[in-house]
Amino acid sequence: MNNKIEPLILIGFMGTGKTTLGQFLASNNQLSYIDLDEHIAIQENKSIPEIFEAIGEQGFRKLENEYLQECVQRYDIISTGGGIIEGDESFRILKEQPKVIWLDCDIEILYKRIKNDSNRPNANNKSLFELKSLYSSRVSRYNEIAFIKVNSSQSLSDLQNDIMEAIVCE
């Protein structure tokens, strides 16, 4: 990636489609892409739940910050984990980035997508009430660092158009 180009960083709650959209944008625009959680799992040779179990959420957030620092220098598009804004250092890095895109979606739709996903340690087997509470605790931090907020319940093409329009109009 050319260091003069700022990466497009996708943030948002679990299940909003950050990975799907990131892959779509990268493929359609011939840009480099990385899914931060997937990158962490590969580099650490463990799944995200295994990392959480081994070193706890605080330990994971430290790893997440280290890999985020590396990835913002190397990739055009980065999809992050839903809890990236929980780590203060990662939050600070994201706050300095000009193209942070917040993908948002109705919590009930998200609940249906993620409630039984064993790869999401903060969501697996949680009630809708518990997920709403977690979502609510993160909204202000997403909002604080987002360049734009888009509704991810629309088509990938429409999302791409909304994002590109916002970037061009910047």
Swiss-Prot record:
Q: Mind telling me which GO cellular component terms the entry cites?
A: cytosol
Q: Which keywords appear in this protein's UniProt record, sorted alphabetically? A: Amino-acid biosynthesis, Aromatic amino acid biosynthesis, ATP-binding, Cytoplasm, Kinase, Magnesium, Metal-binding, Nucleotide-binding, Transferase
On whether Kinase is a keyword of this UniProt record, the answer is yes
Concerning SUPFAM superfamilies, the annotation shows: P-loop containing nucleoside triphosphate hydrolases
Compartments in which it is found: Cytoplasm
Name the major location.
Answer: cytoplasm
- Which residue ranges does UniProt annotate as crossing the membrane? none
Question: Alphabetically, which GO biological process terms does the record hold?
Answer: amino acid biosynthetic process; aromatic amino acid family biosynthetic process; chorismate biosynthetic process
One short Pfam family name for this protein? Answer: SKI
Any binding details for the cofactor?
A: Binds 1 Mg(2+) ion per subunit.
Enzyme Commission number(s) of this protein: 2.7.1.71
UniProt pathway annotation: Metabolic intermediate biosynthesis; chorismate biosynthesis; chorismate from D-erythrose 4-phosphate and phosphoenolpyruvate: step 5/7
- Which residues participate in Mg(2+) binding? T19
Write down the InterPro entries for this protein, in alphabetical order.
P-loop_NTPase, Shikimate/glucono_kinase, Shikimate_kinase/TSH1, Shikimate_kinase_CS
The answer, when asked if Amino-acid biosynthesis is one of the entry's keywords, is yes
- Where substrate binds, per the record, is at D37, R61, G82, R138
Function comment? Catalyzes the specific phosphorylation of the 3-hydroxyl group of shikimic acid using ATP as a cosubstrate.
Its quaternary organisation is: Monomer.
By what name is this protein known? Shikimate kinase
Q: Give the classification, highest ranks.
A: Bacteria, Bacillati, Bacillota, Bacilli, Bacillales
